[in-house]
């Protein structure tokens, strides 16, 4: 959430940000917000004036009664009217503040100055790579669907029977390979990269979604259980960030870094017409998430560190990849800056997104009220929050199966995963 003081002082800058994000239609929200803010200021002043009048006259009434100069009934009657006015103003103020908050919640984050200008994903910029690793694929490669079916690793048909399209079933060595990936990533991030592992709930309340920015902007993308007021998480970022919602963090404990595995659930509303075969677009997938809470001046250094931690996984697995910087028209509403890591699919002959690494600056912390006191004293400030997929397994599995296949239809297990799987080859 943006600081309303910043919006008051820089309304045109906010509108320019909306233009860069291809959200110029939301510019009237800025004017409406400032109008409501001015109304609130006037209403607060009127309320304060009436309360001051009531306090002053209450003292006069007490003095009249104490000195025996009368009953003060006329003044008491007037103050009852004043109290009724104050009650009406308080009610109106509460409604107005709710409207202001809802407007603030719908505005996207500021963009970092280094975010490139662009209208869509076609204008994203290569940041690093391509990073290549040698794989002997001098034969007609099979795609992950054919490999998964022929080797008994994946069963999309039975997943569709059980739940619906986009809910895969891992079977046999496919299930063990998936679990090996998750455990390898968690172990690497906790042992080598300094993250504390957490295992969060897969269901959250609306306050948690609001805190990380998925609500109300992306309400149509989450699965909702209305009877319980709960939502299936789209990413572990939501519960892990909300671990510290409403808390004052200790300055000397920053940065705080968590790594968490979770299943992720996304409705993928609006994906009609996109390639939804196999793992290319699913409603449920597994992911290891990295979440960081930092001092503001350290957050862009932390962004590069998180990116390097995600890259380290791909380097260990020897999966070819590249890193792109998302342009202003493609970056998520919550992020101030974002990198995407894309893995190469030889069968699809294209890159597939496997990770996003984002700096939200104080956007989530302001929504979630996560603060710290610099030096342990003084005025509290909002921390900066960051997150990165480290990594999502679905498209990673696509690239892994396709790169590690052999001419005779087997899959060689990456060396770093063999201690986890207990086997070297899938046949």
Curated annotation (Swiss-Prot):
For L-serine, which residues are the binding ones? Answer: 235-237, 289, 389
Molecular function as annotated in GO = ATP binding; serine-tRNA ligase activity
Q: In which pathway does it act?
A: Aminoacyl-tRNA biosynthesis; selenocysteinyl-tRNA(Sec) biosynthesis; L-seryl-tRNA(Sec) from L-serine and tRNA(Sec): step 1/1
Q: What class of enzyme is it?
A: ligase
Q: Which domain of life is it from?
A: Bacteria
GO terms for CC? cytoplasm
Which keywords annotate this record? Aminoacyl-tRNA synthetase, ATP-binding, Cytoplasm, Ligase, Nucleotide-binding, Protein biosynthesis
As recorded in UniProt, its EC number(s) are: 6.1.1.11
Taking the record's annotation, the residue ranges forming a coiled coil are none
Q: Where does ATP bind?
A: 266-268, 282, 353-356
* Catalytic activity of the protein: tRNA(Ser) + L-serine + ATP = L-seryl-tRNA(Ser) + AMP + diphosphate + H(+); tRNA(Sec) + L-serine + ATP = L-seryl-tRNA(Sec) + AMP + diphosphate + H(+)
- Which Gene3D superfamilies does this UniProt record tie to the protein? Bira Bifunctional Protein, Domain 2 (3.30.930.10), Serine-tRNA synthetase, tRNA binding domain (1.10.287.40)
Where is the protein found, in the record's own terms? Cytoplasm
InterPro entries, per the entry = aa-tRNA-synt_IIb, aa-tRNA-synth_II, aa-tRNA-synth_II/BPL/LPL, Ser-tRNA-ligase_type_1, Ser-tRNA-synth_1_N, SerRS_1_N_sf, SerRS_core, tRNA-bd_arm
Disulfide links within the chain = none
Q: Which BP terms from GO are recorded?
A: selenocysteine biosynthetic process; seryl-tRNA aminoacylation
List the PROSITE patterns. AA_TRNA_LIGASE_II
Q: Which NCBIfam families match?
A: serS
The protein's assembly and partners: Homodimer. The tRNA molecule binds across the dimer.
By sequence similarity, the record places it as follows:
Belongs to the class-II aminoacyl-tRNA synthetase family. Type-1 seryl-tRNA synthetase subfamily.
Q: According to its record, what is known about the domains?
A: Consists of two distinct domains, a catalytic core and a N-terminal extension that is involved in tRNA binding.
What the protein does comes down to:
Catalyzes the attachment of serine to tRNA(Ser). Is also able to aminoacylate tRNA(Sec) with serine, to form the misacylated tRNA L-seryl-tRNA(Sec), which will be further converted into selenocysteinyl-tRNA(Sec).
Protein name listed in UniProt: Serine--tRNA ligase
Q: Which organism is it from?
A: Chlorobaculum parvum (strain DSM 263 / NCIMB 8327) (Chlorobium vibrioforme subsp. thiosulfatophilum)
